[in-house]
Curated annotation (Swiss-Prot):
Assigned protein family: Belongs to the SHMT family.
Protein name in UniProt: Serine hydroxymethyltransferase
MF-aspect GO terms: glycine hydroxymethyltransferase activity; pyridoxal phosphate binding
Catalytic activities: (6R)-5,10-methylene-5,6,7,8-tetrahydrofolate + glycine + H2O = (6S)-5,6,7,8-tetrahydrofolate + L-serine
Compartments where found: Cytoplasm
Amino acid sequence: MTDDIRYQSLTELDPEVAAAITGELDRQRSTLEMIASENFVPRAVLQAQGSVFTNKYAEGYPGRRYYGGCENADIVEDLARNRAKEVFGAEFANVQPHAGAQANAAVLMALANPGDKIMGLSLAHGGHLTHGMHLNFSGKLYEVAAYEVEPDNFRLDMDKIREQALKEKPQVLIAGWSAYPRHQDFAAFRSIADEVDAKLWVDMAHFAGLVAAGLHPSPVPYADVVSTTVHKTLGGPRSGMILSKQEYAKKLNSAVFPGQQGGPLMHAIVAKAVAMKIAATEEFKDRQQRTLDGAQIIAERLTGADCKAAGVDVLTGGTDVHLVLVDLRNSQMDGQQAEDLLHEVGITVNRNAVPFDPRPPMVTSGLRIGTPALATRGFDAAGFTEVADIIATALAQGAGADTEQLRARVAKLAEQYPLYEGLEDWKLL
């Protein structure tokens, strides 16, 4: 142990914070993370994000910085941009957004003026806060027209969206979602945008990893601009990114800096570069396939006879993506109770509103269950089949579920598919 505070380990300097980190590691290892927007980053991403790039200020862009000493920052940002363009087949990439919300704010700043009309999927029907929710900047700065899913099948009707767009004439048409379990028709959105002379922006934050692996239709050929986070299915650091056609490059760069942000977080950008390298590998493609397969296994199990008898249903009857939306409107449980029940057995999910939900947002009538983190742990068909049965049994039995027995099954899965083996030897603490 040293008296020089600069060289003390975290455990030596701040044991309270170190204990919280150790506690979080134990939680992630011993439970099953099934929040659809969460994932586990590889060791190399952890190392990159904890590197000395934490120290570097680099306002501007490679070759045009407002600070000196940016030669290595330029290298890693160029790597991140070029790798992102290659992975997604895009003409332009900006990797500086701190998060998905900042990326989305920059997109709207580049494509619209305050007071212009934007049209995206309603938050209550699976859209995102930044697509026009009234308390969000997007709902305060822009006029909003929201489209919705159909009440009979909970899917989008592109003919009705076209009719609405012709009536509303938005300046920006938004595709993408945060809770919609089916593919969207990007070609149809492009056609509608062209017909009403709107820009098409696609937010692919949730399904970007599937797109990178070729397992989900890519919005890049159709959209004027595409935004994404780098975590979720991509499995990189928590951050944002923007892709577009080259004609929007200057506006988007200016919208990110100085429009929305000052200096970029270089430690996050170097981690994005690593994540984009991983996204081009065969291992990544295999992981995305297991992510998809796992979601479909869970959806199928949750449509079983025991779940139906308990009033548990799967929205749209299945899934095309990495998440399953569970409809509990006819169940004895609400979303909060179901989330708490699964938490008790060691499975972390989030309660989620369903379209036309009669319950308030903090309670909800649904669950959103995701598979990316388990796929990263190595879950295969057998593992997903077991966790699907645990979830279905818990939801079907409700308050009468044997939580102790179900938790034992979860613990066995956590041991069978270990997380961050040997992390204690990585000297992170």
